[in-house]
Amino acid sequence: TPLGTFLSQEIDQFNHLLNVIRSSLQLLTRALKGEVVMSSTMESMFNSVLFNQVPKNWAAAGYLSMKPLASHFTDMLARVEFMRTWCERGLPTSFWLPGFFFPQGFVTSLFQTHSRIHKMPIDTIKFYFHPQPFMSEAQIQKPAASGAFVHGFYLDGAAWSTEKHCIVESKPGELRVALPPIHFEPVLVTAPQQPETYECPLYKASTRAGTLSTTGLSTNFVLSLQLPTGGGNTTGDHWVRRGVAALCMLDD
C-alpha cells in the first residue's frame, strides 16, 4: 500500500540517522580516551555537544530542526517510538505528521490511497480540512473512514478558540499555540472551496524558509491548511496580513 511504502522509506531514514549517531558517538568516545586521533570533525562534534547544539554530521543525516540538542534528542526518540508503534500495532488512529522525515510524502500517500480505492487520477483530488472539537488525539476512537486524522501542529501568529472552533487573535505574550487534531478528507478538486477559511501555510520549522525542491516549492513547506475564520470581519486576508502560519515543531 502507499502508506506501507511510505513507512518503509521513513524507517530507512531513521535507521540511517541512528547509525550515524551511534557510530560517531562511539568514535568520539574513543577519541576522548586517546585511542584514536581527535579529527577536526570529531572536535567540531564535541564542541557542539558541549554547547547543546546538534552536531553538523547528525543534522546532515537528519531532518530539519531548530531545536537545541537536548530537545532535539527527546524529539527524535519520540519520532522513533511513533514509527515503532506503527510497525508493531498497525495503522494509528491519528498520524503525527510532524514526526516524519518527509511529511510531504505522507500527504502524497493519502492521495494515492484514495486514488487507488476510488480508481480516479491523483490530480483530481484535494483535501477538505476538519479541525476536531477536542485538543488531544487520544480522544479519537477509530481511524478516519476516508483520509486520515493528523495531529501535532502549532499555530504561529494567532490563537485557536475551542469554543468558537476557529482561529482568533493571540493573547498578549502568547506567540504560538497548539492546534487540535485535523481530519484530512480527500474530495474531488471540483468540490466547492471550504467557506470562511484561511489558507494557512504549514511549515516544518519556524524559519519558514528552505531550499527549493524539484517541484519549485520550498523543502520547508508541507501544504496549505484551510482553517475556519469564524466569518465576520476577520476574513482570510486579515490573517494573511498577520503572517499567520502553522508549524510542525517549536524551537525549544
What are these regions (language model features)?
Residues T1-D252:
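Long C-terminal appendages of very large multidomain proteins
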